UniProtKB/Swiss-Prot annotation:
Source organism: Mus musculus (Mouse)
Major enzyme class: transferase
InterPro entries cross-referenced by the UniProt entry: ATP-NAD_kinase_N, ATP-NAD_kinase_PpnK-typ_C, NAD/diacylglycerol_kinase_sf, NADK
The name this protein goes by in its record: NAD kinase
Enzyme Commission number(s) from the entry: 2.7.1.23
Residues with Phosphoserine modification: S46, S48, S50, S55, S64
Coiled-coil boundaries: none
Amino acid sequence: MEMEQEKMNLSQELSADSASYNCSACHGDETWSYNHPIRGRAKSRSLSASPALGSTKEFRRTRSLHGPCPVTTFGPKACVLQNPQTIMHIQDPASQRLTWNKSPKSVLVIKKIRDASLLQPFKELCIYLMEENNMIVYVEKKVLEDPAIVSDENFGPVKKKFCTFREDYDDISNQIDFIICLGGDGTLLYASSLFQGSVPPVMAFHLGSLGFLTPFNFENFQSQVNQVIEGNAAVILRSRLKVRVVKEPRDKKTAIHNGLSENGLDTEGGKQAMQYQVLNEVVIDRGPSSYLSNVDVYLDGHLITTVQGDGVIVSTPTGSTAYAAAAGASMVHPNVPAIMVTPICPHSLSFRPIVVPAGVELKIMLSPEARNTAWVSFDGRKRQEIRHGDSISITTSCYPLPSICVCDPVSDWFESLAQCLHWNVRKKQAHFPEDEEDS
């Protein structure tokens, strides 16, 4: 009786918003999610499961990707103690759709540099955006410095309308409504690096080599871009890692060489600190040294292991199909909230890759016994040296990358596994003839 009374008292303490929450997978009630859109940047964009979209019937699902809500009573007397402060309202990933609070007016076009095959698609896309949709198009300054674009007189009138920016110098985070990438997976990673806070929706066209993260084909770009502008598109929120590198104070020359003079430099008790948003992975390796790397890995302040080998990869589910997959990690769907820890050629027969909850904080430091320094890179960029006393703190960022889907998050992912990585491709075994089966 006392336990039941305590449970009733705790239930009454829940706020009205908390009490109104129902899991659509368990209760079949979609009204709550329709009336409570997940908001993005103010006055620009949002995600919702709005039934007003033209293709609503195409994306409604009978089951949530989150799975059913667990029953929290166990046997006749036991139950889980309810804590109102830990209740989270999370929308079903299968129902996330892009919608606009106001019509989009500006678009950032990211083109793979020094690729002549992309010049014609780039020109066609920009002309369509400017002349047909009256969009303000942003491009990186070095894109317009391409000799093929400079020498094209027919493209001159359009080129004058571009808004240009320079990486690491100009902040365009509040000017861009959505992003279009032309190239391979690297263009999407580059787009992520440009936005260290909220990221505009990204539409990625497969015009590169691999294209696991770029699901759109360019042949029908006009109709596909129109759907995005109209707000009729499925979206997958690709989680990113928030990485903070804290370094012991050293001479000024070394600090600048290590990239610490860039935007984001901070001081922390006399130490130097930088923060990055990472879409794929953080890689800590032994660099040019011939010795094994020797780094300690902490989880929420507790030492869990010491990595002795070529290094360690800390990746998002999106990054699980990149370097981590080559190192033997499992491929994890981007909607799974998790962080992967994968050793690189460990000098151990029992060091297997692990998956930890998305909410933990990992901290990586050189072991006191380490014979050499280590090197760290973030999505293959900003590579720098890590010495004794330096630390790398990693947790899930609150700023995901909203990637626009062709169909839906599940279908697109398995399509990429099949088409790009040729997952489980094998010649099928032939069946026995009927006469052999009878014998």
